[in-house]
Amino acid sequence: AATRLAVREAKRLTGKDAPLHIVGFSNGGALAMKYSLDTLDNAELAKPQRVILISPMIGITSFARFSGLAGWPAFLPAFSKAAWLNIMPEFNPFKYNSFPTNAARQSFLLTKALQKQIVADARNQKLNSLPPVLTFQSVMDSTVSTRAIVTALYNRLPDNGSEIVLFDLNHAVRFNSLLR
């Protein structure tokens, strides 16, 4: 609902004829992709002309399905910190540092629903109406599954100009001389 509200407000401010490019990072990438897929079934939603994803949460580790269990001890006051996978100072305005167990569970459920929708839309040939998707993904990402982005999304996309940019560390460079 938040994504639909944001797009509706953006279109109100820019005018209905302005192009719509949706950009999403991590969980926002999953929401951007979900919205784009939802437009294939709902003509009232503004259709994007381009989808740009940065480390999109198309899939995460399967252990996230059990993250809700990790928070159960938090019902006892002495174990209240169990509701969090990690608690850190919040200094980054673009990313939460602390992560509640329920957020991990909700992220897992979102990725499963998104993957199911992608499969159904591919089977029904609806992905042919999807705008081009441009994705930037680090192969070193420990949260988002690069494999899921390729297998669950890109292997199902039509030949519409969609691209994935994978990047990694330069393992050949030696930094020892810089650190002396």
Question: In which residue ranges do the predicted regions lie?
Answer:
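Active-site nucleophile loop of the alpha/beta-hydrolase fold
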Residues: 51-63, 169
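Active-site signature of alpha/beta-hydrolase-fold catalytic machinery across serine-
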Residues: 34-38
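Gly/Ala-rich beta-loop-alpha elbow adjacent to hydrolase catalytic centers
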Residues: 23-28, 32
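The alpha/beta-hydrolase serine catalytic core
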Residues: 59-118, 179-180
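Short beta-strand immediately N-terminal to the catalytic nucleophile in serine-hydrolase-like folds
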Residues: 22-24, 54, 136
